[in-house]
């Protein structure tokens, strides 16, 4: 019994916790959508690839060891034909054997490995930034879903107000019908309109559920139908917004990477130095006059400087300069388009603020007209249709206000998103 009581208490607490769920904020929706977007997995893959590549490049300074062997038969060999008294020089066999081990150690590579490692790091940064650009685009989708739900919530509140007015009208007309001063058809008109309002609620709830379901997919969390969304704080945009979009960092990284390619070209055309050791076993050895198997080795310093790259160095750098100019053009186009969008949003904000101010005045007037119609309905001066017309007129005025308020909030959020501050 005690155990059963504990289970019941825990279940009750679970129900209370679920019902007291905190409203979902727009920023939290952003974060959850980005964390659960499949593309986010590419971040770790880029890090792993970069780590492996840089590690491989670092091994370029490790000793390079190779083994080789050969057995040959020559049609002719070097021999000493001049007779020397008291000395007999044997001829070298035509079949010869050689097994070699070569060890090469790079001492100076002109900075190639360093440049390649820097390039690889910049390439990883560029790929990561491409991911950030794609993730940022998610915000536009989340904005649409989030504000769509808020818009539907406001519409449902307005329908509830209409239902209140209709119920008040129904009570008055019912009293009139009971007293024989109104026709029942007037009552039926209001009841039919009340049923239409209930249908409107069903439509709005269904649309809201659809948006919540899609939002659940994006954030990878099962949101209940009655999930509350926190209305974002309206932020007035500045006169000159500083653009902080991830695309700008991408362009900057691309320029750094092209600059790294300049360094790599210079490094490839510098001299290289290293030490080497070659050891072997063969017949003959280094002493060609000794016709037998022997161990031998050779060691020393090697300097290599190839001038072939100097022929193409100038054109290779010009190609990079063209690429840098292309990136600059892409950046200019992006900034132009972004600033154009910001100007459009500012114009939209100004228009909506004026419309909202006008909506308030219209609603005040419509309320006065509706209240007067309510009194006239109660006194039997007008019919239910006349009263219903004024109720619908106020409803339309409030719907316009709701639409403009949500559009204003959307324009403010869009402004922040476009500028990169959201």
Enumerate the predicted regions with their spans.
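Short, basic, low-complexity termini and linkers enriched in Ser/Thr/Gly/Pro
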Residues: 5-20
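Bacterial Sec-pathway N-terminal export signals of envelope proteins
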Residues: 20-66, 181-183, 219-261, 270, ...
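Membrane-embedded beta-strand positions in outer-membrane beta-barrel channels/transporters
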Residues: 30, 100-102, 146, 298-302, ...
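Acidic, low-complexity, intrinsically disordered peripheral segments
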Residues: 30, 223, 400-422
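Small/polar (Gly/Ser/Thr/Ala-rich) solvent-exposed segments
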Residues: 41, 64-83, 90-93, 104-133, ...
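Amphipathic alpha-helical coiled-coil segments
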Residues: 42-57, 134, 138-157, 175, ...
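Periplasmic alpha-helical coiled-coil/stalk elements that build and connect Gram-negative outer-membrane
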Residues: 52, 134-249, 348, 352, ...
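Transmembrane beta-barrel architecture of outer-membrane proteins
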Residues: 96-98, 144, 189, 272, ...
